[in-house]
Swiss-Prot record:
It comes from Bacillus cereus. PANTHER family: ADIPOR/PROGESTIN RECEPTOR-RELATED (PTHR20855), HEMOLYSIN-3 HOMOLOG (PTHR20855:SF129). This is Hemolysin-3. Keywords: Cell membrane, Cytolysis, Hemolysis, Membrane, Toxin, Transmembrane, Transmembrane helix, Virulence. The keyword NAD does not apply. The keyword Transport does not apply. Its main location: membrane. It is found in: Cell membrane. Might be virulent against a mammalian host; when expressed in E.coli, the soluble extract has hemolytic activity on human erythrocytes. The activity is not inhibited by cholesterol or activated by 2-mercaptoethanol. Might be pore-forming protein. Its in vivo role in virulence is untested, nor has it been shown to be secreted by B.cereus. GO terms for cellular component: plasma membrane.
Length: 219
């Protein structure tokens, strides 16, 4: 009984940490979304507003669904929140791609990659609906591969984002990828909360890259 209580206590502590870390992300995502929309409205076209909105909303949903999953434990909603949480990862990946592909790259390459990424994201969401608690390692690998598909357009991205913007993009990708190691490291105490911190860091890098370099004020 003591061992069981110890495990339960540790579980509660870790879930509190998980909820707090991404709860902070959910709160910060609200002003981030507002800033993105205002910035795109002032300095971009209608397509920029759409792209920035899609990105901002996808970021907010990821943190919202994650916070709900780790905050509310009830048999009737746990599976639903798990599906929403895992699906939101696909949404964030595709949502993050959207401003880079619609604004930074544009043209045939941008539209082609956009179609591919959103098709993969939709396929991943459908997969999660049926297999949300299975193939976790394979799903994590899929997230990473999707995130790094942008490497096929590395040259035009670097040229358009400049060195500083590209550095932020690269830093964000690295933080997301390194964080996945902790996500899979289940024996490490608070591994999930540590992963959440890497996700927050990756989101911050991507946000500032989109805000300052995808649609510079000077343009």
């Amino acid at each position: 009984m003591t061992e069981k209580m110890t495990r339960m206590t540790q579980f509660v502590k870790e879930e509190i940490a998980n909820a707090i870390t991404h709860g902070i992300g959910a709160i910060l995502s609200i002003p981030a979304l507002i800033i993105l929309i205002i910035h795109a409205s002032k300095h971009g076209t209608a397509s920029a507003v759409v792209a920035f909105t899609v990105y901002g909303v996808s970021m907010f949903l990821l943190y919202l669904f994650s916070t709900l999953l780790h905050s509310i434990h009830h048999p009737k909603v746990e599976k639903l929140f798990t599906i929403l949480d895992h699906s939101a990862i696909y949404l964030l990946i595709a949502g993050t791609y959207t401003p880079f592909l619609l604004i930074t790259l544009r043209g045939p390459l941008g539209w082609t990659l956009l179609a591919i990424i959103w098709t993969l994201a939709i396929g991943g969401i459908i997969f999660k609906i049926f297999f949300v608690r299975r193939f976790i390692k394979a799903s994590t690998l899929c997230y990473i591969i999707m995130g790094w598909l942008i490497i096929v357009a590395i040259k035009p991205l670097y040229e358009n984002l400049t060195g500083h913007g590209f550095s932020l993009l690269l830093a964000g990708g690295i933080l997301y990828s390194v964080g996945a190691i902790f996500f899979l490291w289940e024996k490490l105490p608070f591994n999930h909360a540590i992963w959440h911190l890497f996700v927050l860091g990756g989101s911050a890098m991507m946000f500032f890259c989109v805000l300052f370099y995808v649609l510079p004020t000077a343009s």
